[in-house]
Swiss-Prot record:
Function in brief: Part of the high-affinity ATP-driven potassium transport (or Kdp) system, which catalyzes the hydrolysis of ATP coupled with the electrogenic transport of potassium into the cytoplasm. This subunit acts as a catalytic chaperone that increases the ATP-binding affinity of the ATP-hydrolyzing subunit KdpB by the formation of a transient KdpB/KdpC/ATP ternary complex.
Underlying gene: kdpC
Similarity comment: family membership: Belongs to the KdpC family.
Protein name as annotated: Potassium-transporting ATPase KdpC subunit
Record organism: Bacteroides thetaiotaomicron (strain ATCC 29148 / DSM 2079 / JCM 5827 / CCUG 10774 / NCTC 10582 / VPI-5482 / E50)
Subunit-structure text: The system is composed of three essential subunits: KdpA, KdpB and KdpC.
GO terms, biological process: potassium ion transmembrane transport
Membrane topology designation: Single-pass membrane protein
Protein location: Cell inner membrane
Gene Ontology, cellular component aspect: plasma membrane
Transmembrane segments: 10-30
Family annotation (InterPro entries): KdpC
This protein's record includes keyword Lyase: no
C-alpha cells in the first residue's frame, strides 16, 4: 500500500509538471527566443492579411507557384493536420500519386515524367508544409511566367530572391516559402 501511494504521488507530480510547468517553460522560451514571439508569421499584401507564412496553403491557379500536396483534410485544413499513413506500396496511395503526376504534367507540358520532383506529388508528414525546394520552384517558372505574361528570367529572379538559406549555413536545406514567393510575384506587378 505504501508503494502504491508513492507511485500515485510521483504520477501526480509528473502529470502536473508535464501538463503545466513544462508547457509554460516552452511558451516562455518561445516568447523570449522564438521568431515572432512564438506566434504565427502573418503575411500581408496591400495591407491585408493573406495568410500565415508558417502554414502551407493551397494554390491551384497557374499564375501562382504551387506548394506540396496536402493530405490534411480538404486542402490544408490545419484542424486535420497529419500524414496519410499510406505506405509506398498501398494501391490507393500509388493511384493518388499517379493522379498528381498527371495533373502536374497537364499544367507543365514541357516536362517529362522523370522531371517531376517527387516533392510536388507526395504530401508532407504534417500535410501543411509551407516550403518547397528551389528545384520545385524552378520547374514551375515557365508555367508561371507564361500565365503572368512575364519572361522566365523575370520570374526566375523573383525565385532566386526568395531562396532561404539553411540556418547558420548548416542546419537544414535551402527552401522557398510558397506564400512569400507568391506575394513577391503579386508585388512585382
Amino acid at each position: 500500500m505504501k508503494t502504491l501511494f508513492k507511485s500515485l504521488k510521483i504520477t501526480l507530480v509528473f502529470c502536473v509538471f508535464f501538463s503545466v510547468f513544462y508547457i509554460l517553460i516552452l511558451w516562455l522560451f518561445a516568447q523570449v527566443a522564438g521568431p515572432n514571439k512564438g506566434n504565427a508569421e502573418v503575411a500581408t499584401l496591400d495591407g491585408k492579411v493573406v495568410g500565415a507564412a508558417n502554414v502551407g496553403q493551397m494554390f491551384t491557379k497557374d499564375i501562382y507557384f504551387w506548394g506540396r500536396p496536402s493530405c490534411a483534410g480538404d486542402g490544408y485544413d490545419a484542424s486535420s493536420s497529419s500524414g496519410s499513413n499510406k505506405g509506398p506500396t498501398n494501391p490507393e496511395y500509388l493511384a493518388e500519386v499517379e493522379a498528381r503526376i498527371d495533373t502536374f504534367l497537364v499544367h507543365h507540358p514541357y516536362l517529362s515524367r522523370k522531371d517531376v520532383p517527387a516533392e510536388m506529388v507526395t504530401a508532407s508528414a504534417s500535410g501543411l508544409d509551407p516550403n518547397i525546394t528551389p528545384q520545385c520552384a524552378y520547374v514551375q517558372v515557365k508555367r508561371v511566367a507564361q500565365a503572368r505574361g512575364l519572361t522566365e528570367n523575370q520570374v526566375k529572379e523573383i525565385v532566386d530572391q526568395s531562396v532561404e538559406k539553411p540556418l547558420l549555413g548548416i542546419f537544414g536545406t535551402e527552401k522557398i516559402n510558397v506564400l512569400k514567393l507568391n506575394i513577391a510575384l503579386e508585388e512585382n506587378k
